Amino acid sequence: KEGYIVNLSTGCKYECYKLGDNDYCLRECKQQYGKGAGGYCYAFGCWCTHLYEQAVVWPLPKKTCT
């Protein structure tokens, strides 16, 4: 599974500005989804890869970014 890492309290994606390989996104993806996750900056949001199937990613149902 892949997807944008999401802030569960705000419903917003984690923003990034350095597209492609991005240490911040990689670190955040691993922190939220585990050591096996990968991450990079895509379309100014942190995109996480190699997630477990039940991982919660953006957009959150019934919660828009505030």
UniProtKB/Swiss-Prot annotation:
InterPro entries with a match to the protein in the record: LCN-type_CS_alpha_beta_dom, Scorpion_toxin-like, Scorpion_toxin-like_sf, Scorpion_toxinL
Keywords, comma-separated and alphabetical: Amidation, Disulfide bond, Ion channel impairing toxin, Neurotoxin, Secreted, Toxin, Voltage-gated sodium channel impairing toxin
GO BP term, example: defense response
Modified residues (Threonine amide): T66
Keyword Secreted: yes
GO cellular component terms listed in the entry, alphabetical order: extracellular region
One function term, GO molecular function aspect: sodium channel inhibitor activity
Subcellular location: Secreted
Keyword Secreted recorded: yes
Origin: domain of life: Eukaryota
Tissue: Expressed by the venom gland.
SUPFAM superfamilies linked to this entry: Scorpion toxin-like
S-S bridge residues: C12-C65, C16-C41, C25-C46, C29-C48
All copies of domain LCN-type CS-alpha/beta, residue ranges: 1-66
Free-text comment about domains: Has the structural arrangement of an alpha-helix connected to antiparallel beta-sheets by disulfide bonds (CS-alpha/beta).
Function of the molecule: Beta toxins bind voltage-independently at site-4 of sodium channels (Nav) and shift the voltage of activation toward more negative potentials thereby affecting sodium channel activation and promoting spontaneous and repetitive firing.
Family: Belongs to the long (4 C-C) scorpion toxin superfamily. Sodium channel inhibitor family. Beta subfamily.
Name the UniProt record assigns to this protein: Beta-toxin Cll1m
Phylogenetic lineage: Eukaryota, Metazoa, Ecdysozoa, Arthropoda, Chelicerata
